[in-house]
Every structure is written in C-alpha cells, then in structure tokens.
C-alpha cells in the first residue's frame, strides 16, 4: 500500500491493497440483486463495536463516560441524498482506521472475488442479479454498491482526536483529522453519499422494513432519525434473540439472525437453540449452514462461535467446538464465566470445557435427528461438510461412534449410504466393511480391485476425499465389523457365493498357468514382493495390492508424497489365472524367453496404470510395447 502525506503531516492519501481495489470495482459496478445487505453489514459492524466497548469497559469503566447505553442510529437526509449510520461503540484510532478500511485480512477474499466473477457471468447470461455477496459478507465495502462516496468519522473511546476516512471507491482513500463539529463524542459515523439509483434508501418505511427483517435481532438498540435534527424513533429494542423462548421466535427471525452471524445468504439446514441449566448455565443458538465458506480449511480463521457472558460479548476466538464442527455458526451466552475473564484465560477455563462438551454432543445428536427425519436435507449438509466430519473420526476418539453414524458414503451400490445401512446389507459370510480409497471417483468406480466384489454383490465404500485414507486407520470397526481395504492383503471372498451361481463352477488352474506365475515371480523379483493367483479379479488380467500389514496402496502414496515414507514398498502382483491373456502367455512355453520377459514387465506396467500410476521407465515401456506389437504383427502375417 502506497501513501502520500501532506506537508503538515496530518492528511494522508493511500492506495488500496490489490484485493480491496478489485473488490471495490465489483461493488461500484455491482449487478447484485439484493443490495439491501449493505445496511445489514454496516449495522453488524456497529453492533460489534458497541459490544467490544462493553467488554473493554468492564476493566476500564471510564471509557463509557456519561454515555453508557449502547445505540446505533440511522439518519436520513433525503434532500442531500445521504444516509448515515452512527454507533457509540469502541471507535477507531487513525492506525486502526487505515488497517480496518484499507486492507482485507480475510483469507477467503481471493476466493470470493473469483466466485463473484463466475456468479456475475452466470447472471449476465440468465438476466438475473447475483447474491454471492450475501453469502460471503464482505462487510464495510458493500457500502459502495449504493454510494459513490463514503466518509467514515471515528473517535476511539478514551481518545481526544477524531479521524476522517474518505473514498469514492476508485482505488484510493484519504485519512485526515476530523473537525470536532462533525465528529461523534465516541464511536463511528459512516456517511453514505447515495447514487441516483439508490436514493430509495432515504425512504423511512423501506429502511424500517430492512432493519427489522435483517437486523432486528442485534443486541444493541437501533433508532431511526427521519431527517437531521428530528427526534429518534426506536425500531429495534436490542433484545438478544437467543434470550427469547423458542416459542416466541419465528422462522424468519432465526433465518435473519443466521444470515447476520454466518455471513451467508442461504437458510440454515439446521437450527439448534437450547438453554442448559444445572452445573453450567448457558444458552446456545447454533446453525448448520447448507453451503460451505471458502475459508473453512484456513488454520488462521477466527472461531465460528461468538461467546457472550451475561449478554456481554467476550470473544469470537474461543474454542467452543472441535475443529471437525468448525462449519457451525452461532452464539453461546454463559451465566457462569466471570465478566472480567481475559481472552487468554478463557481457554483454560473448566467451565468453557464443559460448555464445549455439552454443545458438541447436542449438535451431533441434532444432526442425527435431521439425518433420520430428512435424508435429502442431511445429504446437502454431508456434501458440503463431509470431509470435516471425517477429521473427527481420528481427532475425537470419544465421539468416534457418533461421527461414524453421521457419515455417508458413495458405494458400488450407488447413492449415499450410512454405515448402518451398509452393515444391514452384509452378505452371508461377509465379516468386513470393504473400502477402496483414491483421489478420483471415476477411477475408483472402474478399478479392477472391485471385480470380485461386484461378482458377489458385495458393497464397497468408494472413498475419494484426501482425509479418507487416514480415518480408516483410526477407526478399527463399526458395530463389530472391521474396515478393510480391497487393495490390501487377502480378500476373504472365497466364502461368499457369487451372484451368478453358474459362475461358481470354475475350471481348475492349469499346470502351465501355475508355471507362468512362478516365472513372473522370478522375473519380477526385484520389483514386486510376491506374485499370486487372485480371487478379486474376474475381467482384468492383473492388479497390484499392498501387503497385509502396513498402509494400503493409497495411504502409502500419500505418505511418500509428503515425505513421511522414504519410498514405496514392493507391491504384490495379483494375476487372474483364468484370463485369456494369461492362459495364452502361459501356453508359450520356454521357446521365446525374451518375449515372455517383455510380457511379464508389460503386465506389471499394466497393473501400475490401472492403479493410477505411470510405468517406472517410460522409454523402456515404449520400446517394450513396440517389441510386443511387432511380435504380434509378425505372428498374424505368418
């Protein structure tokens, strides 16, 4: 960010950082269908400022001076086409103003910008407005959807000087000392110079409706001033929504609160509102979204749950839910934590640990109820947040069974299935829950490792999330049935009858095939640990599997890729003894050993390709293929 300072050293002109500049261009030239969200964002910022002041005033009451009641005021000036949002919250110093309004710390900004471009392109084709801004909530900058000039005047609580920030949204902003006549005694004033097509936001009835619908739940009173100098009218009483009985709260109120606290524009898939009494007394209002935020996998993001103590905001960085539930949004209000607890000491509090345990259990149980009651709605939750659920299988041993019950998997049977459904459909003599892990769902579906299982109607879990290869090693079983990779060790398929009973009568493996397998084992001894006849293959000639002990094929690839293993172990080459290709190669005898060695190594490369790998030596693979094709052509013309 570059800056220019006036000769008196007070006024300063700066250039927005690159991401902000792009974002502002999108706001200025916005085609968003719901521009009302700018007001929700400004009110949300104002409410946060009031709550932060209330927290700081616990240790420094002098910050409140003679203005202890928090308030947000919206003032209309229709004649000048201006809209002003005032709060008497914590305010900003000059440096805080530059940092808060000139940069974006949010890790998902780039992703938001890219997604918004996609949405704009789609909406242009369809002739509709897009609503991605409501989903991601870019806060203050949304003001430029309705204003061609924005001025922010702020005075930090306890400070003497006030500062003015101004920008037309075209790439630069200025920071200057504010005149005392226009500065609030404490807090922040945001003045919007509305564009011609946004002058409707000076209509009192329209503003009242927007505020009541979108922000009537904020825990700070909101007043409306119809024109400068007029008496204020209260349009929201500041009663925190979570303190009201559930029976007194309508669905629309819950949705509006969710949109404010989550920064999403959709409706929640699940709302969890309860009051706990007993050893710990607290109220929780939590939401499970339908869509995923871009920053869910960022390690430095703020916590998704706001912590209050007796309606005083404490922090949004408390560890109130385990990481595998980081997609949940909402508030928790404790009656037991001391108001003067420091943010540093919160994490050490046994009260907080008890609250975390309670709300974690409640969220999991409510998700289980949703899954039972509305499989379609729960399916959307799983599609959005399934990878995070799976993290909990190896992170939270005490909740493993509950999390496994919530998991849904794509299988060789088709649609999403629960493990309970899977176990209920086990075949006679089936003792394991079989799975195939990999990076590509389509490749998994076509894997030769599945052939023997399909022939017997045995369902296999198809696991294509990166986390899958890890949690299966941490979850020894489900309802007494162990998890077993179809790419590792023996299959135990011999005891399970085939669907086609006529296929059970298979010809004995010939002596020549047995000898050929021994030849393969000798020829490939430096590349594979063993060569053996396969039960799992019915249509393909070969496949690679891992030894019974150690990681399966996919996990081994991941560990080698991240440097946890120095190299891959030798795989086992399984051969389908009844495949026509194997029978033909076995019938060659010892007449052309060089050709047989070429075919042996070609079979191994074939297995590697089917396993998602490349031949170990591309040049030699090409030469070997040419020799085999030449031999085949020579034989066909003989």
From Swiss-Prot:
Residues 558-638 are annotated as: C. InterPro entries: HATPase_C_sf, Heat_shock_protein_90_CS, HSP90_C, Hsp90_fam, Hsp90_N, Ribosomal_Su5_D2-typ_SF. Belongs to the heat shock protein 90 family. It comes from Nitrobacter hamburgensis (strain DSM 10229 / NCIMB 13809 / X14). SUPFAM superfamilies: ATPase domain of HSP90 chaperone/DNA topoisomerase II/histidine kinase, HSP90 C-terminal domain, Ribosomal protein S5 domain 2-like. Residues 344-557 are annotated as: B. Coiled coil: none annotated. It comes from the Bacteria. Residues 1-343 are annotated as: A. GO terms for molecular function: ATP binding; ATP hydrolysis activity; ATP-dependent protein folding chaperone; unfolded protein binding. The keyword Nucleus does not apply. Transmembrane segments: none annotated. Keywords: ATP-binding, Chaperone, Cytoplasm, Nucleotide-binding, Stress response. Molecular chaperone. Has ATPase activity. This is Chaperone protein HtpG. Its main location: cytoplasm. One of its GO terms (cellular component) is cytoplasm. Homodimer. SMART domains: HATPase_c. Disulfide bonds: none annotated. It is found in: Cytoplasm.
């Amino acid at each position: 960010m570059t800056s220019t300072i006036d000769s008196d050293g007070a006024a300063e002109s700066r250039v927005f950082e690159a991401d902000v500049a792009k974002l502002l261009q999108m706001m200025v030239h916005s085609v968003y269908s719901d521009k009302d969200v700018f007001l929700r964002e400004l009110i949300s910022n104002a409410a946060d400022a009031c709550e932060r002041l209330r927290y700081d005033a616990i240790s420094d009451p002098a910050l409140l001076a003679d203005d202890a009641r928090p308030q947000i005021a919206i003032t209309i000036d229709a004649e000048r086409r201006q809209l002003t949002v005032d709060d008497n919250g914590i305010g900003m110093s000059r440096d805080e103003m530059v940092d808060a309004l000139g940069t974006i710390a949010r890790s998902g900004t780039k992703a938001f910008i890219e997604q918004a471009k996609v949405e704009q392109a789609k909406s242009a084709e369809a002739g509709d407005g897009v609503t991605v801004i409501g989903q991601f909530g870019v806060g203050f900058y949304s003001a430029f959807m309705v204003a061609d000039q924005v001025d922010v005047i702020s005075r930090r609580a306890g400070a003497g000087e006030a500062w003015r920030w101004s920008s037309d949204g075209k790439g630069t902003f200025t920071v200057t000392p504010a005149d005392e006549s226009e500065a609030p005694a404490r807090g922040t004033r945001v003045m919007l110079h509305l564009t011609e097509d946004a002058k409707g936001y000076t209509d009192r009835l329209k503003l009242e409706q927007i505020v009541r619908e979108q922000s009537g739940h904020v825990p700070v009173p909101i007043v409306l001033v119809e024109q400068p100098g007029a008496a204020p009218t209260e349009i929201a009483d500041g009663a925190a929504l979570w303190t009201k009985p559930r029976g007194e709260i309508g669905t629309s109120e819950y949705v509006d609160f969710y949109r404010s606290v989550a920064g999403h524009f959709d409706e929640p898939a699940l709302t969890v509102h309860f009051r706990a009494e007993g050893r710990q007394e607290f109220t929780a209002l939590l939401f499970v979204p339908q869509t995923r935020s871009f920053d869910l996998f960022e390690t430095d993001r703020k916590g998704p749950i706001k912590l209050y103590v007796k309606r005083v905001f404490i922090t949004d960085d408390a560890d109130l839910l385990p990481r595998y539930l980081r997609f949940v949004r909402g508030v928790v209000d404790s009656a037991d934590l001391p108001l003067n607890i420091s943010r540093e000491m919160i994490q050490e509090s046994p009260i907080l640990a008890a609250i975390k345990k309670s709300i974690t259990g409640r969220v999991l149980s409510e998700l289980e109820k949703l899954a039972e009651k509305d499989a379609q709605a729960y399916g959307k939750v799983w599609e959005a947040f399934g990878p995070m659920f799976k993290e909990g299988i190896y992170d939270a041993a005490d909740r493993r069974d509950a999390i496994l019950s919530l998991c849904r998997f794509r299988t060789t049977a088709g649609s999403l299935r629960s493990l309970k459904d899977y176990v209920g459909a086990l075949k006679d003599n089936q003792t394991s829950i079989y799975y195939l892990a990999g990076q590509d769902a389509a490749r998994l579906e076509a894997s030769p490792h599945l052939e023997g299982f399909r022939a017997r109607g045995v369902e296999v879990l198809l696991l294509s999330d990166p986390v899958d290869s890890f949690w299966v090693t941490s979850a020894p079983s489900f309802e007494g049935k162990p998890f077993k990779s179809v790419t590792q060790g023996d299959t135990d398929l011999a005891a399970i009858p085939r669907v086609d009973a006529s296929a059970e009568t298979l010809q004995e493996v010939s002596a020549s095939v047995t000898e050929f397998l021994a030849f393969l084992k000798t020829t490939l001894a430096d590349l594979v640990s063993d060569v053996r006849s396969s039960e799992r293959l019915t249509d393909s000639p070969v496949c690679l599997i891992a030894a019974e002990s150690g990681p399966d094929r996919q996990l081994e690839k991941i560990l080698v890729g991240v440097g946890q293993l120095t190299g891959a172990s030798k795989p086992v080459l399984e051969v389908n003894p009844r495949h026509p290709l194997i029978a033909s190669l076995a019938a060659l005898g010892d007449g052309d050993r060089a050709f047989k060695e070429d075919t042996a190594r070609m079979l191994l490369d074939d297995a590697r390709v089917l396993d998602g790998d490349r031949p170990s030596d591309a040049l030699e693979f090409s030469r070997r293929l040419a020799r085999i094709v030449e031999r085949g052509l020579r034989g066909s013309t003989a």
